[in-house]
Amino acid sequence: MHLQHLFVHRKYVATLLAGVLLVALGSFIALVAPRASANQNTGVKVSFSPLILADKDGTEFPGKPAHLEDPVRMKFAWDASSANPQPGESFSIGLPAEYRYREIGRHDDLVLGNGTKVGDCVTTTETLTCTFNTAISAASDLKGSGNQMIVAQKVTQVNKTTFDANGTGTEVFHPNNERILPIAWVEKDLGKYANSLKR
């Protein structure tokens, strides 16, 4: 009788522990997994300026092509004039396989042309998602612009690719309308170093 009671008690404890673990696991996943995109407003139009080669500090180099692993400046404009945007709705920019966002989890303000903040933008490796806040309800002239640093991660044979502009495929030229080139190795004069080893 005592053994039977002990068995039932252990079974109850095991079930309780399993339930606690499931709740904890669910909470952990909710914390570490990227939050599901807010309700996407596909009426927001996104367009791009030409991609520009840059360096790690963001200095731009117009007229030069990008090599593998080079930083590239992506400038975009968004227009929600006919989208009736609501708080909690979002738009996104998805990158093609040739690029990745340089900073994962980067947060930037989403602002109108007059500087009013109407949301926040956050990056993953492949996607920039901008979500409107409550200020969008009272805003007018619902247009703005932004920019992000991306990185060339694939050598190409063509000079353009397709970005996902909030659900619409949009062709964009690589920097200087050229293909992405292999890493440019720089040869250095090792003569002086070699001579120093002989001494």
Positions of predicted regions on the chain:
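N-terminal secretory signal peptides that target proteins for export/translocation
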Residues: M1-R10
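C-terminal region of N-terminal signal peptides and the immediate post-cleavage residues
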Residues: G26-G43
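Bacterial N-terminal signal peptides
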Residues: L16-F28
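Short beta-strand elements of extracellular/lumenal beta-sandwich folds
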Residues: L68-A83, N195-R199
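Surface-exposed beta-strand/loop patches in extracellular or lumenal glycoproteins
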Residues: A77-R100
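Extracellular/luminal low-complexity Ser/Thr/Pro-rich, glycosylation-prone repeat/linker regions
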Residues: L31, S37, N166-A194
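A surface/secretory-pathway sequence property marking extracellular, secreted
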Residues: Q40-D57, A97-A135
